[in-house]
Amino acid sequence: MIKRIMLALALLAALLTGCSSGPNYKIDMTKPLYFQKDKAMPFEIKVLENKKTVKGLKVTVEFSMANMDHGSHKAKLTEGKAGTYAGNIQLAMPGKYEAAFTLEKGGEKTEKIINLNVKKPQGIASINGKWITNDDLAFYRFINQLQLEINRESAKKQYRGKQLEEELTYLKSQEKMLDDKNQLLTQIIRLRSMAMLAEEKGHKVDPANVEQEIQKVRNQYSQYTSVKRLIKGYGEEKFWTKERKQYQSIVLIQQVQKDLIAQAKKDNPKAGDQEVYYEAQQKYEDLLVSQVNSLKIVIL
């Protein structure tokens, strides 16, 4: 509040003396700021002038609550790509804040204030505003654990002696990857991003196809004692409800993959299956990168 009053007085003084108010910068929040207790949280802005991004600025910010006095919180922002500036700041509580920015370039300083409502996050990341939660991460961890158990049981049936020992040692080393948050997030973002692309292309979820895929998974899992035991411990109804939701996205993605295979065959009718599938996979990865870049993804 004090910062806003001081800025108003400075602007009034400029008007009275006929001085220029300096560059006409506009600040847009490109990544929202959320509150987590005892943790500095990331945020990002874009600075514009006449609808063009402004590069080469030195940017600092001071946050203060709009309606209460809980002191101020300062941060220095680092320049990124295309006129973006990012930083981390630890706030005392959620609520309405005034963010007073100081933007400096060529020795000239400009001050701008924006108001924002800082809320508690509903998850650990979001894609176009749709949250990825810790529960989502836990489910993906469990799915990966099931796959490890399948590989372990399969190895015991397939190998003997030293070869079995080496395979089991390798699988044991993979267990630490189960808790890799970045890998789990990447899996979720890849799946959900491409499912969103499928919907954008007009594809729909066919419940019959989903149930068909679920039955295939049930048949596979039923062959492994350790997998059945883990699912029972997780809660069978809970597991299959989540798995069914997962396969709604997978069925959508399969339609995109079929489109790409059909296009690859059309582009090169003399190509063999291996070449067609390779070309389709390359196109899929290109589409994935393009889709992810087009989405507003926030990772906390």
Where are these predicted regions, by residue range?
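Aromatic sugar-binding surface patches on proteins
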Residues: E79-A86
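Bacterial signal peptide processing site
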Residues: S20-G22
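Short flexible loop/turn segments that cap and initiate beta-strands
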Residues: E49-F63, M68-K74
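Beta-strand-rich structural segments
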Residues: L33, K37-T53
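Residue-level recognition of secondary-structure-to-loop junctions
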Residues: E79, L91-M93
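A C-terminal, polar beta->alpha supersecondary segment
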Residues: Y247-L300
